[in-house]
Amino acid sequence: MNRIAVLLLAFVLFSCESVNTKRVISTDNAPQAIGPYSQAIQVNNTLYLAGQIALDPITGQMVEDKIEVQTHRVMKNLGAVLSEAGFSFDDVVQSQVFLSDLNHYKPMNKIYAEYFNSEPPARAVVQTALPRDALVEIMMVAQKP
């Protein structure tokens, strides 16, 4: 009987450890999704942020057509979503940057760097067509210890 109790206890403990909790993150301080997706999804200690373009969260309109202005707006939008979930830019471990023109790389990079301390996340940058004629879109993954 003790053997069965020990096996049952072990099964229950291992089952609890493998449970993943999924939570949708949404904030009015960042633009609402313009399609069938969430601003972010948190699974346990990992936060997956959807790509953000330079939409003003209040008006829903694109900000000025300059890469520096758009990059700041995108990072502020991402910061609002991070904050809503209890994360910060210090928790970001990976990002993907999409540019409409690779000539925007240097000015985007300068603004992007302002949001990270000495240990920026891993990152990829690619050129692609973007919705609403955006100049930049950025998506991120953040991880809590």
Q: Could you say what each language-model-derived stretch is?
A:
Residues 4-8, 16-76, 80-93, 98-145:
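N-terminal presequence-like segments and the immediate start of the first folded domain
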